[in-house]
């Protein structure tokens, strides 16, 4: 009958790194403790940004720029990016958790709107970015016992060893289900490395169960006695943009004033209201004042 089978090598092997054990309760508690330790942060960062993908048919990589990030609970964020070499402002954005403002000096555009207003087809890539999405990736929220159910899954991830070989490594995956007005929905998945039991990835889902944010965390360091990732990558698949923050300096729990999260409308700027129909969204400053 001839040979009915053949033997072939297995390409993936398991990582030989020593792995730590934990439990569902311990991982939930670690998220809560980390959240309690950080009430505010102020960071100097290098920002890498890419825009595009299958929908646009191409990807544009932007030159790395220096930036500053301020965050304060419960939902305040202020992020500034500086143009290379000249170090003038490339963008300036603030959010109070509900509404945001975005100032883009090179285009003389001042954008305002709610964080839940999406513009995925915008010809202005910066206008697809929402400060609230950055905030949610930056500071992992604790599990809310009144609204969340967290289920532990033993999973695995693909890594590369020191020789560049592809290996499998077991991880812990905390799947968070949230109670909403429409019922229970998939909210988040937090992936913990079994090497250090730190969150190394977080998926945030929309109410339809689609991945809204894919955040990766790497190179944890101690800042003011608190362990925090020095590299955070945020990918938004629907809007097709990717932002990586490489932290150069981080101060935790320093007092931050309300005026540090304020952004005034510059005189002469083109004002874009994303809450309005796109045909009437952009109005000159004089017109926007006359309609008040």
Predicted ranges, named:
Residues 22-25, 104-186, 265:
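Flexible, processing/modification-adjacent segments and terminal tails
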Residues 39-41, 65, 75, 89-91, ...:
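Envelope-exposed proteins and targeting segments
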Residues 2-64, 276-292:
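N-terminal leader/targeting segments and the immediate start of mature chains
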Residues 30, 66-71, 93, 215-222:
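Extended lipid/amphipathic-ligand handling interfaces
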Residues 47-92, 99, 288-290:
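Post-signal peptide N-terminal segment of secreted/secretory-pathway proteins
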Residues 150-268, 272-277:
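Gly/Pro-enriched, hydrophobic low-complexity segments
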Residues 5, 74-136, 269:
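An acidic-aromatic
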Residues 45-47, 73-75, 81-85, 97-99, ...:
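A mature extracytoplasmic/lumenal domain signature
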């Amino acid at each position: 009958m001839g040979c009915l089978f053949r033997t072939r090598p297995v390409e993936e092997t398991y990582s030989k790194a020593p792995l730590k054990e934990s439990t569902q309760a311990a991982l939930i508690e670690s998220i809560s403790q980390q959240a309690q330790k950080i009430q505010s942060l102020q960071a100097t960062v290098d920002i890498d940004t890419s825009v595009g993908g299958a929908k646009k048919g191409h990807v544009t990589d932007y030159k790395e720029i220096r930036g500053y990030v301020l965050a304060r609970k419960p939902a305040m964020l202020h992020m500034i990016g500086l143009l290379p070499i000249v170090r003038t402002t490339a963008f300036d954005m603030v959010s109070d958790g509900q509404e945001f403002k975005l100032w883009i000096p090179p285009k003389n555009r001042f954008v305002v709107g709610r964080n839940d207003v999406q513009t995925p087809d915008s010809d202005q890539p910066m206008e697809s970015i929402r400060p609230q999405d950055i905030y949610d990736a930056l500071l992992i929220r604790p599990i809310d016992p009144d609204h969340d159910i967290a289920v532990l899954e033993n999973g695995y991830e693909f890594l590369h060893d020191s020789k560049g070989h592809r290996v499998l490594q077991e991880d812990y995956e905390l799947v968070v289900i949230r109670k909403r007005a429409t019922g229970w929905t998939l909210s988040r998945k937090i992936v913990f490395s079994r090497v250090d039991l730190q969150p190394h990835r977080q998926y945030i889902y929309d109410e339809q169960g689609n991945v809204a944010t894919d955040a990766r965390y790497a190179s944890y360091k101690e800042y003011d006695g608190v362990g925090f990732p020095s590299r955070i990558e945020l990918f938004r698949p629907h809007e097709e943009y990717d932002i990586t923050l490489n932290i150069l300096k981080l101060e935790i729990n320093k007092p931050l004033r309300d005026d540090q999260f304020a952004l005034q409308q510059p005189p002469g700027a083109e004002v874009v209201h994303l809450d309005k129909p796109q045909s009437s969204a952009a109005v000159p400053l004089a017109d926007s004042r006359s309609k008040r």
